[in-house]
Amino acid sequence: MSINIKSISYSFKNKTLGSCLDISVESGEFAIITGESGIGKTTLLNVIAGLKKPDHGEIYLDQKILNSESVFVEPENRNIGYVFQDFALFPHISVTKNILYASKEKKDDLLLFKKFVEALNLENHLNKMPYELSGGLMQRTAICRSLMMQPSLLLMDEPISNLDHENANAVQLLVSEYVQKRNIPCLIISHDIDQYNEIKFSKKLHIS
């Protein structure tokens, strides 16, 4: 499984960014995306996820065309896990239901649910509603949900920005194991690569 982005450009705040941007991330690899605040890093992930159409270019996920001049695959058909910076939890359902929302209802889902919940220290919060959670708990819930969908590609926007050192390490260890075991690519936006002491980045992309 790999993600290949060819000659992508996209509009952002009346500017065109990423002109002829090329990215290739292979199976089991991590890529980090850096750049000044407001430069369009999140917009790039939105383009990859299908939440925004690029102006030009092509996106392939394991040889399947997601974007081209003649093809546009809708977000729900891309099998991409996306951890949003603002978490994007469903406000009127519990932590458990948020996590299981994207579950594919396979036999091993219960085991995965238990593993992820324990790894991210969510056991005591499963019956709570999102408004009862701290920013860190919401972030871990969103990460857990994205892993439960068993995606072919994982996108993460500042996934440890609200976490203390212990929980940040727990997230990194779980995600690193998950990406390598499932052999999928992962793209992470971060303002500080030094936060990531448990993840090895194969690719670094700076947007300016």
Name what the model sees in each region.
Residues 57-68:
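Conserved ABC transporter NBD signature motif
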Residues 66-81:
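ABC ATPase NBD coupling module
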Residues 129-133, 137-139:
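Conserved ABC ATPase signature
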Residues 143:
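Hydrophobic anchor residue at the start of the ABC signature
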Residues 148-152:
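A short, proline-enriched helix->beta-strand linker immediately N-terminal to the Walker B motif
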Residues 154-158:
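Catalytic Walker B motif of ABC-type/P-loop ATPase nucleotide-binding domains
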